[in-house]
C-alpha cells in the first residue's frame, strides 16, 4: 500500500461520499432515492441549531456524557512502559459507545416523520442502543441479528425484548453480522416509506459512513479537550478496536490533523491471521465492494466474501468502514491484528488490576495498548478507547474457559 500525502483529513469524504478510492454508493436502483432523501435530511439537520441542541441535551442528560478519561495506574505499572489511559465509553447509558450514534439517528428519524426503525446487530450493543432510543422516542423497533450471535449474546437479546423491540434471527450465510445487515437492507427497501434504517457502524453506502462518524465524533472531541485540560498535552498514541470501526473513527477523528498523535486500530485476528480464521479486513483483506461501499474486505481470489471468525461478535465482520481503509492507505493510521487469546489475556489483566470488565471488542484495543505501552517510555501517554463493558460477554468467556454458569 503506497501512502498518499494528505494535507487535510477533514476534507473527506467528497461530495459523492468518497474517501479517496473508498466509500461511495454501490446499491440497487431502488435504494438511490431513499439514500438521497436521507442525505438531504441529514445535511439539513446537522446545520440546524435546534437539532444540534436536542442531540447535545440527550447526550448530557440521557446518555450521561461526558465520559471520563481514567488513568489505569496499576495496569500501567504491571505492563511497564507508557501510561495507559482509558476513555470510558463503557460508562454510557446502555454500556457502550453505540448510543452516541443511535440517539442521533433516531432524532433524525423522528424529524423525517418515520415511525419505525430497524437495525442490525452483532454483539447486541447496537441493537440494545437502538431499542433504547426507540422506547425513548416512541418508535417501533425491529432488530436483525445472526442466529450465531443470538446464541452467544443471549443477555443482550433479552435486553432488547425488555425494551420493546422485536428481534428477528437471521440464519443465512454464517448467521452473523454481515448477514443481519443484508436482511435489514432488504427490509428497508420494502418498507422505506415509514422505516428508518439505523446502521450501527461507519460502513454502508453514503451518507452512513460520515453520519455515523459525526455522531460518534463526540468521543474524540471530548478526549482531546480532556487530555489538554488534565495532562496539558495530547496523547502520544491512541488505540481503538475496529470491526466496522465506529468507536474507532469516533476517537480518531479529532486527532487526524495532529501529526504528533500516532493512531492504531486493533482488528480481530481470531485464531491468527495465518490460520484464515480471523476478521482482520485491513491487515489481511483487499479492496472490494460490500454493503454499498468500496472498502477492504475479506474475500477469496474470485472476490467472493468469505466467512470470518472472532471470539468477539462485534468484530466478526468481513469488511471495515471506508474511512479506515483510506486512513490505512494514506499511512495516517496503522491497523494490527489482535488474536482471541491476546484479547482474553487483556480482559483478565484489566479486570485484575483495575476492577474493570471490558467488552471482548474493547479488550482487543486494551491488548494493543499494552503492546504499545511496552514499546514507549514511562512518560508517554497511550489513550485507549474502552468502547463497551463486558457484562454481555461473561457467558462467552466462561464457556471458553470450561466454566459452567
From Swiss-Prot:
Xref: Pfam families: PALP
Stored CDD domains: Trp-synth_B
EC number: 4.2.1.20
Cofactor entry: pyridoxal 5'-phosphate
Modified residue annotations for N6-(pyridoxal phosphate)lysine: 98
Quaternary assembly: Tetramer of two alpha and two beta chains.
Name the UniProt record assigns to this protein: Tryptophan synthase beta chain
Amino acid at each position: 500500500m503506497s501512502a498518499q500525502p494528505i494535507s487535510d483529513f477533514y476534507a473527506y469524504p467528497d461530495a459523492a461520499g468518497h474517501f479517496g478510492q473508498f466509500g461511495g454508493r454501490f446499491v440497487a436502483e431502488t435504494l438511490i432515492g431513499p439514500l438521497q432523501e436521507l442525505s438531504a435530511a441529514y445535511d439539513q439537520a446537522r446545520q440546524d441549531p435546534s437539532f444540534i441542541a436536542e442531540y447535545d441535551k440527550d447526550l448530557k442528560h440521557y446518555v450521561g456524557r461526558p465520559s471520563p478519561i481514567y488513568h489505569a495506574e496499576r495496569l500501567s505499572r504491571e505492563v511497564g512502559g507508557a501510561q495507559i489511559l482509558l476513555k470510558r465509553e463503557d460508562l454510557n447509558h446502555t454500556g457502550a459507545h453505540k448510543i452516541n450514534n443511535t440517539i442521533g439517528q433516531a432524532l433524525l428519524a423522528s424529524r423525517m416523520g418515520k415511525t419505525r426503525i430497524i437495525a442490525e446487530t452483532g454483539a447486541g450493543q447496537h441493537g440494545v442502543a437502538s431499542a433504547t432510543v426507540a422506547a425513548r422516542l416512541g418508535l417501533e423497533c425491529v432488530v436483525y441479528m445472526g442466529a450465531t450471535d443470538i446464541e452467544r449474546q443471549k443477555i443482550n437479546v433479552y435486553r432488547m425484548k425488555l425494551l420493546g423491540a422485536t428481534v428477528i434471527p437471521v440464519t443465512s450465510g454464517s448467521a452473523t453480522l454481515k448477514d443481519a445487515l443484508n436482511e435489514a437492507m432488504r427490509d428497508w427497501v420494502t418498507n422505506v416509506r415509514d422505516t428508518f434504517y439505523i446502521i450501527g457502524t461507519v460502513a454502508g453506502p453514503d451518507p452512513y459512513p460520515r453520519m455515523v462518524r459525526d455522531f460518534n465524533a463526540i468521543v474524540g472531541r471530548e478526549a482531546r479537550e480532556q487530555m489538554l485540560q488534565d495532562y496539558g498535552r495530547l496523547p502520544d498514541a491512541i488505540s481503538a478496536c475496529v470491526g466496522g470501526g465506529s468507536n474507532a473513527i469516533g476517537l480518531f477523528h479529532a486527532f487526524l490533523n495532529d501529526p504528533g498523535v500516532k493512531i492504531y486500530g486493533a482488528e480481530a485476528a481470531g485464531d491468527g491471521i495465518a490460520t484464515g480464521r480471523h476478521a482482520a479486513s485491513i491487515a489481511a483483506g483487499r479492496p472490494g465492494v460490500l454493503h454499498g461501499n468500496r472498502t477492504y474486505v475479506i474475500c477469496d481470489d474470485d472476490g467472493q466474501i468469505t466467512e470470518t471468525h472472532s471470539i468477539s461478535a462485534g468484530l466478526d465482520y468481513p469488511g471495515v468502514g471506508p474511512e479506515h481503509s483510506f486512513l490505512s492507505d494514506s499511512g495516517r493510521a496503522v491497523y494490527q491484528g489482535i488474536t482471541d487469546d491476546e484479547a482474553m489475556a487483556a480482559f483478565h489483566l484489566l479486570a485484575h488490576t483495575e476492577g474493570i470488565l471490558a467488552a471482548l471488542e474493547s479488550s482487543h484495543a486494551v491488548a494493543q495498548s499494552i503492546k504499545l505501552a511496552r514499546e514507549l517510555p514511562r512518560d508517554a501517554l497511550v489513550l485507549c478507547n474502552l468502547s463497551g463493558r463486558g457484562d454481555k460477554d461473561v457467558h462467552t468467556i466462561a464457556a471458553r474457559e470450561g466454566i459452567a454458569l
